[in-house]
């Protein structure tokens, strides 16, 4: 009894300290029983009645609390039970029991060594209803034996120190509606300070704008997947889900919700945009402030309303400021030239806040009373166009002479159609003069002699009055117009005498009316006879017919001879040679085979381009943007919409303003060449525009641009089969050109275009190129130089361009493709390239290049052009490789490489090098001399230790020279083993 009293005294004095530091209960724990919160007696059943005893105390707030204690340590065989009241389970699947208790150290109590215990037992029993005061021990299931981590002694009693223990045990799963807990004392001195029973749940939460409800874990093994619901004013982007763990924790958030248009995320909710702000789209972006000249007056706005006289076009984004129509154009100036006028004006002072300002020209023909006007004739032409002008100038032609016109220049932008105010325009009135005659189109040579030429021509198509006379201008071609003669003729023919024999003369003719002279005709060249023999135009035709007939008879005789030879057994005797009928070094082309016609043989380039190309109406073409600058002007992308056909994307080359006649001939000459080709691997000409300005060449649009830059951009991203497919397309296109008798002269990856389907097409059909006597030896066009790295040796040395020289170039293209656009011969100078190729050196195989493809490269680079394969053979070889992909898996090995590769210097005698500079010259890296000299690599030992990283550090960063130097170093090491080699 003294023992029990000591516990009572200790509890009553120390229970305050036990609860002095309150720890907040976690939000994921739900109490089913908490003895500290029960007011009044607990009313638990104690059996036997003299066992557990209920006592009272107070907490730190002096609130009464109830505890149980037992301390029957003097008697043997103690079996004291304490049972709680019936506890409803609610939704718990697993429960936790938290016990706070004190326990007396048996060693501190005298005379109880045989009867005192330091543990007690915890039991539970499930039931669907309350059993009242009935108590049966055998119905309870043991949970655990509870021992104290710390027990108190007699000394602690004296110091009034209470050592409180806390133990937690799990119970479950529980299935019935409720349960009892029971505590069995077997002889301990123990006091139950508090009992708490709880279960864990995942509490309500909001994550990624999705609400997840309170969730109780199902069991201890698996996670519970919970589907979330979006908060108000939001919608699912991805279905929101989270997993509830057995510890009551939310894990692995998946999916999310986003705020509706007009709402933004604030404080885990979607709240309406404030007035003056808007949000146009669903999503978790913030509300934005209304753009200039717009506002909102209510919450939750999805867009802002424009102010009065401001508008938003249908295609304008909500974030764009509201705009208004532009003001009228300013400072209109007219420059009249007979029956045409050039109108210039200044931009409006106010563009309305937009960049899409364009101008429309309204033309009115007026009587002598300016107020009486009518629309102009549809024959009036506007250059570049009448509507949608982006520049502040327009040329109007084909007006009537001596007529009053009024031109109204409208300024419009993207919101002009939405505006109710009147049109914003500036007007100018003009009166045309009498027009000069149009040019003479054609000059015909009627008769020539050694000192005279007779010419005739047609009257101009538009005389614009009575022709008074014609001015004939002529000069010797070699004089280049430095000295010329002019005479006048009243009719449409003239004989010019006192000319030099066997001399070419250039003629131009223009007509004159009361309004003045028209423009000169284009230049025509005619030659006088070398002697007194003269021949009329009609006689020359007779002679030509006779010559043609004679040639036809000869050819017919040859054909008959061949047929007789076949009949008499020629086939058996010459079977291998009968495929072609040979004439010298060439062969007879049979009827039906299409042959390339050089457009430069036409006197009039317009005639050639109209024969081979389709004339397009400029109104069917729309230009989107400028993508580059070409040889004669800008290169643009745009769209072509022909009547009854689908709109297509096109590339557009334009002839720049201020072009010369020669530039126009060359520009149209390229179209005349392209127009003759029709092949899936040749760039397709859609047509030309020559009847309005600017003059344009329109081709199909290739989305991926030039092949070399495309490959560099997608380095190592294609399979070998895909690369071979590209090469096969190029070879097929070149076979077509070769069969037509066309020599490209500039075949390189930069001149191959590739579309979105990886189809390669040959382009850049060539203007005349002149080989300079420059040691760098580059072929020159009017647009720049073409490096000789793609040019065959005979073309460099003898200006001999053939289909075989195109095959050499194809081998370089093959190397470019397999190296993903690497520059042939790297940083070698052109002079070094010429020297190396003449000495038999060839490019090495690119990394991981199939042996079959590298062998094809070497075949294309045969010095004797007759030994190179034909394009027909190249196509056949590539077809076989595509059908047999396994043959492409054999990679060119170092051992199998020929010894004449540019980067294989094993055949170079290292002992011949006296200095580092000599060595670098010998391995084609002379440009590295200063680098190595600067870092004092001057001996064999130091050279042999250089690594790739070392070269990068000293400035040799290009892969080609690195490989050459490393290859030479390996050879140097081999020779160094046999003795020192000064370098």
UniProtKB/Swiss-Prot annotation:
Widely expressed. Highest level in placenta. It is linked to Colorectal cancer: A complex disease characterized by malignant lesions arising from the inner wall of the large intestine (the colon) and the rectum. Genetic alterations are often associated with progression from premalignant lesion (adenoma) to invasive adenocarcinoma. Risk factors for cancer of the colon and rectum include colon polyps, long-standing ulcerative colitis, and genetic family history. Residues 21-541 are extracellular. Autophosphorylates upon activation by EFNA5. Phosphorylation on Tyr-602 mediates interaction with NCK1. Dephosphorylated by PTPN1. Disulfide bonds: none annotated. Keywords: ATP-binding, Cell adhesion, Cell membrane, Glycoprotein, Kinase, Membrane, Nucleotide-binding, Phosphoprotein, Receptor, Repeat, Secreted, Signal, Transferase, Transmembrane, Transmembrane helix, Tyrosine-protein kinase. Changing residue 602 to F: 10-fold suppression of kinase activity. Full kinase activity. Full kinase activity. ATP binds at residues 628-633, 653, 700-706, 750-751. Pfam families: EphA2_TM, Ephrin_lbd, Ephrin_rec_like, fn3, PK_Tyr_Ser-Thr, SAM_2. The lineage of its organism: Eukaryota, Metazoa, Chordata, Craniata, Vertebrata. One of its GO terms (cellular component) is plasma membrane. The chain crosses the membrane at residues 542-565. Receptor tyrosine kinase which binds promiscuously membrane-bound ephrin family ligands residing on adjacent cells, leading to contact-dependent bidirectional signaling into neighboring cells. The signaling pathway downstream of the receptor is referred to as forward signaling while the signaling pathway downstream of the ephrin ligand is referred to as reverse signaling. Highly promiscuous for ephrin-A ligands it binds preferentially EFNA5. Upon activation by EFNA5 regulates cell-cell adhesion, cytoskeletal organization and cell migration. A motif (PDZ-binding) lies at residues 981-983. Residues 566-983 are cytoplasmic. Residues 325-435, 436-531 form the Fibronectin type-III domain. Belongs to the protein kinase superfamily. Tyr protein kinase family. Ephrin receptor subfamily. It comes from the Eukaryota. Residues 911-975 form the SAM domain. Residues 1-20 form the signal peptide. This is Ephrin type-A receptor 3. SUPFAM superfamilies: Fibronectin type III, Galactose-binding domain-like, Growth factor receptor domain, Protein kinase-like (PK-like), SAM/Pointed domain. Its EC number is 2.7.10.1. GO terms for biological process: axon guidance; cell adhesion; cell migration; cellular response to retinoic acid; ephrin receptor signaling pathway; fasciculation of motor neuron axon; fasciculation of sensory neuron axon; negative regulation of endocytosis. Residues 29-207 form the Eph LBD domain.
């Amino acid at each position: 009894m003294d023992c029990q009293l000591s516990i009572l005294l200790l509890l009553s004095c120390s229970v305050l300290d036990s609860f002095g530091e309150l720890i907040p209960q976690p939000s994921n724990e739900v109490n089913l029983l908490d003895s500290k919160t029960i007011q009044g007696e607990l009313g638990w059943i104690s059996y036997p009645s003299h066992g557990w005893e209920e006592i009272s105390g107070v907490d730190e707030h002096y609130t009464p609390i109830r505890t149980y204690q037992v301390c029957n340590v003097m008697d043997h065989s103690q079996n004291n039970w304490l049972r709680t009241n019936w506890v409803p389970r609610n939704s718990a699947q697993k429960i936790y029991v938290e016990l706070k208790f004190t326990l007396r150290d048996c060693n501190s109590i005298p005379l109880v060594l045989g009867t005192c215990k330091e543990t007690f037992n915890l039991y539970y029993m499930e039931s669907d209803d309350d059993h009242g005061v009935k108590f049966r021990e055998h119905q309870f299931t043991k949970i655990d034996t509870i021992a104290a981590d710390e027990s108190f002694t007699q000394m602690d009693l004296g110091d009034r120190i209470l050592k409180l223990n806390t133990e937690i045990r799990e119970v479950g799963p529980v299935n019935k509606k409720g349960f009892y807990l029971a505590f069995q004392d077997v002889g301990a001195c123990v006091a139950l300070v508090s009992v708490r029973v709880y279960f864990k749940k995942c509490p309500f939460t909001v994550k990624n704008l999705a609400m997840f409800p309170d969730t109780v874990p199902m069991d201890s093994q698996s996670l519970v997947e919970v589907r979330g619901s979006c908060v108000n004013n939001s919608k699912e982007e991805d279905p929101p889900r989270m997993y509830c763990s057995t510890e009551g924790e939310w894990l692995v958030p998946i999916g999310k919700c986003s705020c509706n248009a007009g709402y933004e995320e604030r404080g885990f909710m979607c709240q309406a945009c404030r007035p003056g702000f808007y949000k146009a789209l669903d999503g978790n972006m913030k509300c934005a402030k209304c753009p200039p000249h717009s506002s909102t007056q209510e919450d939750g706005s999805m867009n802002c309303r424009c102010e009065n006289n401001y508008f938003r076009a249908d295609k304008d984004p909500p974030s764009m400021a509201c705009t208004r129509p532009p003001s009228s154009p300013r400072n209109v100036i007219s420059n009249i030239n007979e029956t045409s006028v050039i109108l210039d004006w200044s931009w409006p002072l106010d563009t309305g806040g937009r960049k899409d300002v364009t101008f429309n020209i309204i033309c009115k023909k007026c009587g002598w009373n300016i107020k009486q006007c009518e629309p102009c004739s549809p024959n009036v032409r506007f250059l570049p166009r009448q509507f949608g002008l982006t520049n502040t100038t327009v040329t109007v032609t084909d007006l009537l002479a001596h007529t009053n016109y009024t031109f109204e220049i409208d300024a419009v932008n993207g919101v002009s159609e939405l505006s109710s105010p009147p049109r914003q325009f500036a007007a100018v009135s003009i009166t045309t003069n009498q027009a000069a005659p149009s040019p003479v189109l054609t000059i015909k040579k009627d008769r020539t002699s050694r000192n005279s030429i007779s010419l005739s021509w047609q009257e101009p198509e538009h005389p614009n009055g009575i022709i008074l006379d014609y001015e004939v201008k002529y000069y010797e071609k070699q004089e280049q117009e430095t000295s010329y003669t002019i005479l006048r003729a009243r009719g449409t023919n003239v004989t010019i005498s006192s000319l030099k024999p066997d001399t070419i003369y250039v003629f131009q003719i223009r007509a004159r009316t009361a309004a003045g002279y028209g423009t000169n005709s284009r230049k025509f060249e005619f030659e006088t006879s070398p002697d007194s023999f003269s021949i009329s135009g009609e006689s020359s035709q007779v002679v030509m017919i006779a010559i043609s007939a004679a040639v036809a008879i000869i050819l017919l005789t040859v054909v008959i001879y061949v047929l007789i030879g076949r009949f008499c057994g020629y086939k058996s005797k010459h079977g291998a040679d009968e495929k072609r009928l040979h004439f010298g070094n060439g062969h007879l082309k049979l009827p039906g085979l299409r042959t390339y016609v050089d457009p430069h043989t036409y006197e009039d380039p317009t005639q050639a381009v109209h024969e081979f190309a389709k004339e397009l109406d400029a109104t069917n073409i729309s230009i989107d943007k400028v993508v580059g600058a070409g040889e004669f002007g800008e290169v643009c992308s745009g769209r072509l919409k022909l009547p009854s056909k689908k709109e297509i994307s096109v590339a557009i080359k334009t002839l720049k303003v201020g072009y010369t006649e020669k530039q126009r001939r060359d520009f149209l000459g390229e179209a005349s060449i392209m127009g003759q080709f029709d092949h899936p691997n040749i760039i397709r000409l859609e047509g030309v525009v020559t009847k309005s300005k600017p003059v344009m060449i329109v081709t199909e649009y290739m989305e991926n641009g030039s092949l070399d830059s495309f490959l560099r951009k997608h380095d190592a991203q294609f399979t070998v089969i895909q690369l071979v497919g590209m090469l096969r397309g190029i070879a097929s296109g070149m076979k077509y050109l070769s069969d037509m008798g066309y020599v490209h002269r500039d075949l390189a990856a930069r001149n191959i275009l590739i579309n979105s389907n990886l189809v390669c097409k040959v382009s850049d059909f060539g203007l005349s190129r002149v080989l300079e006597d420059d040691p760098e030896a580059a072929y020159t066009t009017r647009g720049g130089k073409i490096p000789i790295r793609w040019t065959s040796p005979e073309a460099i040395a003898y200006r001999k361009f053939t289909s075989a020289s195109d095959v050499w170039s194809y081998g370089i293209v093959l190397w470019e493709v397999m190296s993903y656009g690497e520059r042939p011969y790297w940083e070698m100078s052109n002079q070094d390239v010429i020297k190396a190729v003449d000495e038999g050196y060839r490019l090495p195989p690119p990394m991981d290049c199939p042996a079959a493809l590298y062998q094809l490269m070497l075949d294309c680079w045969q010095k004797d052009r007759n030994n190179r394969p034909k394009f027909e053979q190249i196509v056949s070889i590539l077809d076989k490789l595509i059908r047999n992909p396994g043959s492409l898996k054999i990679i060119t090995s170092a051992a199998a490489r020929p010894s004449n590769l540019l980067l294989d210097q094993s055949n170079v005698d290292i002992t011949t090098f006296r200095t580092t500079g000599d060595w670098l010259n010998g391995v084609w890296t002379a440009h590295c001399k200063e680098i190595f000299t600067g870092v004092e690599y001057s001996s064999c030992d130091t050279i042999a230790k250089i690594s790739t990283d070392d070269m990068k550090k000293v400035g040799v960063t290009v892969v080609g020279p690195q490989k050459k130097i490393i290859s030479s170093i390996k050879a140097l090491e081999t020779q160094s083993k046999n003795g020192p080699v000064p370098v």
